[in-house]
């Protein structure tokens, strides 16, 4: 016997609907997202399993505390795309009305009737899950850093563009220079002796100090005094926000690099021609996971990463368009792999150049190269083997294919 659970998750209360194999309602309940609420629900799940009942659950997310809770209690979890749920609602209600219990009911019945078209969640190891969380949090900090850098750059351009020629706004020099000389007037009032003294105190060479002094003595953009006062205050506020984020990004990068170095997968993932350090290889492996059988084929992986287009056929018409529905984080890191490989892999460079010669844009050529890399990465992931450039080139030679049309056997 099997029960199908529909779980409409929320921050405070989860709606749950349970049906049997015939679609008959077993129970419906609201589960509070508290220790008591989850504990009571867990005991009910354990009782059903003790009676020999298989439990399958449909939920609109592949991770999170509720998903972990269900897995801990032996429930087979099926993540459901929100778009699929939206279309399934029409089976039960054409008015467009919805509620949390109704969505839970739709999820339960959708899983009962359409589970052959869904894939059960195959959770990775705890170490792989931790690495994934670390890389996701690092990317959030990087996005926050980028936002603040853009704001700070725009602010300096508005009243003090010369400061942008002194140093990158995320650098240690900028961290010291901007608070010390927050306005063009502060720099104009400097003597060369004062500047040289400040430069020596902050570790600048005599040559570098001389170059910067020449920059600072150039005429500054004429800006009204009230604009300078307002923008200088904003600059200081942005610097106070930016510097801790810059430090956090550096700490996350080191933590990820150190954490991944202790994992067995580092032995093969680090062999890709993308540099032996940094967070690209750890992020790639974190998105792949280590659950056996998660990826059925390299084509499955390519589609999940958005590296191959979508083809729509109807009668004599055929339309090929960009694949929007995919793992955006995986697509981003595959683009990074493709870009970094241009510096170290001869065949990758040749393939990219061939794509550009055909009139494809940089992004299109990079995406096509990423699709090629995913064929190789799938084999590396599946067999847990390192990348061997010479083996790959020999494979191309055996197949008598030009480097721009390479395949990995």
Question: What is the predicted role of each segment?
Answer:
Residues 1-409:
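A detector of single, family-specific signature residues
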């Amino acid at each position: 016997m099997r029960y199908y659970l529909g779980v409409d998750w929320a921050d405070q209360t989860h709606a749950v609907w349970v049906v049997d194999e015939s679609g008959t309602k077993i129970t419906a309940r609201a589960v509070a997202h508290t220790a008591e609420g989850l504990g009571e629900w867990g005991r009910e799940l354990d009782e059903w399993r003790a009676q020999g009942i298989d439990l399958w659950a449909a939920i609109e997310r592949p991770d999170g505390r509720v998903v972990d809770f269900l897995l801990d209690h032996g429930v087979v979890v099926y993540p459901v795309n929100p778009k699929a749920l939206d279309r399934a609602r029409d089976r039960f209600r054409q008015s467009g009305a919805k509620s949390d219990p109704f969505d839970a009911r739709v999820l339960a019945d959708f899983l009962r009737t359409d589970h052959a078209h869904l894939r059960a969640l195959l959770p990775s190891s705890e170490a792989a899950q931790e690495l994934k969380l670390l890389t996701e949090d690092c990317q959030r900090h990087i996005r926050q850093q980028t936002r603040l850098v853009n704001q700070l750059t725009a602010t300096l351009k508005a009243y003090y563009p010369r400061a942008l020629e002194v140093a990158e706004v995320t650098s240690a020099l900028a961290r010291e220079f901007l608070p010390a000389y927050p306005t063009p007037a502060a720099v104009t009032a400097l003597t060369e002796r004062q500047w040289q003294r400040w430069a020596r105190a902050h570790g600048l060479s005599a040559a570098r100090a001389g170059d910067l002094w020449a920059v600072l003595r150039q005429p500054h953009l004429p800006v009204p005094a009230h604009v300078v006062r307002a923008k200088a205050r904003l600059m200081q506020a942005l610097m106070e926000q930016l510097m801790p984020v810059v430090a956090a990004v550096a700490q996350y990068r080191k933590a990820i690099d150190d954490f991944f170095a202790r994992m067995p997968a580092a032995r093969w993932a680090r062999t890709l021609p993308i540099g032996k350090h940094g967070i690209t290889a750890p992020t790639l492996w974190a998105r792949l996971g280590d659950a056996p059988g998660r990826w059925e084929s390299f084509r499955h992986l390519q589609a999940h990463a958005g590296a191959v287009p979508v083809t729509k056929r109807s009668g004599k018409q055929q339309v090929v368009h960009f694949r929007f529905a995919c793992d955006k984080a995986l697509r981003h890191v595959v683009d990074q792999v493709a870009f970094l490989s241009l510096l170290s892999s001869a065949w990758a460079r040749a393939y990219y150049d061939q794509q550009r010669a055909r009139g494809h844009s940089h992004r299109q050529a990079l995406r096509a190269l990423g699709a090629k890399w995913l064929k190789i990465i799938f084999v590396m992931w599946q067999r847990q083997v390192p990348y061997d450039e010479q083996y790959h080139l020999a494979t191309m030679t055996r197949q008598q294919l030009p480097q721009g049309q390479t395949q990995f056997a």
